[in-house]
């Protein structure tokens, strides 16, 4: 049975406030039946140096991705993962992580691929929890098998592929959420990260550049509904929007903002992103600060 939504007035203006919880709400419901807490970080070692009591760790790389094919795990593997982590199909899952929930949003997006009904983010994530000196532990909870059912992934509503992107160029909004250096073609990866994963640099023609981190404030919380509406004011209600980054993790954060905080009806994450596009043969690429135009073939 899903837990009640967080009634905090700080969340009420969002289109789907039930997709967020505050630290106060999580503290008050900690240990409640039907609540599963998940930590998913970019830095996969953080869980081991202290985490929210009762939280289990999901490693974005080893737990959610197929070990050989570039794809996500299948229904059988997801059910096994949920069993191992003690998560039931009808649990309320609250996910949090480092860096303004960057990777936590990615985990939430994967949960959504499998149709888990009630999955939420902790607003502010791990960093805000620690900044407020809330309780942490080194204890790893012992979980029992939940009998999570095998549910096949449903990619179509929220996942885009390369051909989908080619089909909408110039006709529907395309948002590049990477760093300015990546967008302009100066780098193939973020500053302070190794240059790897793509043979070409730049961005997809017509893509508007809005770095994912602009949706969060200095505390790691999401910006207000009003601020977010201004940031994405070019998106119309009937648009079919696609977001992308390098491997789909930063764009998952933007997907969450557009879908759950602003209520946009048709938003898909192109998780192939630049490590596919920047290696593909004969796809159009633009360098510089302007979105560019669709080339005439």
From Swiss-Prot:
GO function term, MF aspect, one: thiosulfate-cyanide sulfurtransferase activity
Chain positions recorded as substrate binding sites: 250
Annotated catalysed reactions: thiosulfate + hydrogen cyanide = thiocyanate + sulfite + 2 H(+)
E.C. designation(s): 2.8.1.1
Active site location: 245
Gene3D superfamilies referenced in this protein's UniProt entry, alphabetically: Rhodanese-like domain (3.40.250.10)
Keyword Ligase among UniProt keywords: no
Domain Rhodanese residue range list: 31-138, 168-286
CDD domains in the record: TST_Repeat_1, TST_Repeat_2
Alphabetical keyword list: Acetylation, Repeat, Transferase
Top class in the EC scheme: transferase
Tree of life domain: Bacteria
PROSITE patterns reported for this sequence: RHODANESE_1, RHODANESE_2, RHODANESE_3
Other known facts: Was identified as a high-confidence drug target.
Domain remarks: Contains two rhodanese domains with different primary structures but with near identical secondary structure conformations suggesting a common evolutionary origin. Only the C-terminal rhodanese domain contains the catalytic cysteine residue.
Protein name listed in UniProt: Putative thiosulfate sulfurtransferase SseA
Source organism (scientific name): Mycobacterium tuberculosis (strain ATCC 25618 / H37Rv)
Protein encoded by which gene: sseA
């Amino acid at each position: 049975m899903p837990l009640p939504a967080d009634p905090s007035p700080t969340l009420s203006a969002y289109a789907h406030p039930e997709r967020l919880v505050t630290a106060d709400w999580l503290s008050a419901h900690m240990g409640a039946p039907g609540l599963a807490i998940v930590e998913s970080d970019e830095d996969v070692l953080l869980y081991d140096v202290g985490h929210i009591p009762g939280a289990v760790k999901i490693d974005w790389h080893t737990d959610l991705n197929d070990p050989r094919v570039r794809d996500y795990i299948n229904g059988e593997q997801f059910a096994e993962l949920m069993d191992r982590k003690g998560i039931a199909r009808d649990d309320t899952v609250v996910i949090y992580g480092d860096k303004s929930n960057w990777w936590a949003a990615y985990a939430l997006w994967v949960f959504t691929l499998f149709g888990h009904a009630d999955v939420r983010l902790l607003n502010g994530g791990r960093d805000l929890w620690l900044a407020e000196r809330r309780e942490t532990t080194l204890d790893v909870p012992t979980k029992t098998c939940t009998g999570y059912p095998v549910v096949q992934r449903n990619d179509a509503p929220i996942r885009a592929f390369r051909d989908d992107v080619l089909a909408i160029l110039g006709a529907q909004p395309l948002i590049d959420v990477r760093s300015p250096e990546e967008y302009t073609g100066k780098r193939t990866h973020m500053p302070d990260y190794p240059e790897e994963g793509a043979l070409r640099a730049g961005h997809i023609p017509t893509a508007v550049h809005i770095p994912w981190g602009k949706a969060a404030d200095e505390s790691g919380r999401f910006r207000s509904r009003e601020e977010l509406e201004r940031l994405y004011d070019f998106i119309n209600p009937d648009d079919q929007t696609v977001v992308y980054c390098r491997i789909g993790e930063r764009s998952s954060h933007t997907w969450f903002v557009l879908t759950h905080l602003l209520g946009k009806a048709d938003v898909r994450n192109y998780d192939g992103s630049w490590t596919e596009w920047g290696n593909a043969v004969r796809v159009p690429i633009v360098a510089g600060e302007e979105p560019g135009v669709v080339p005439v073939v």
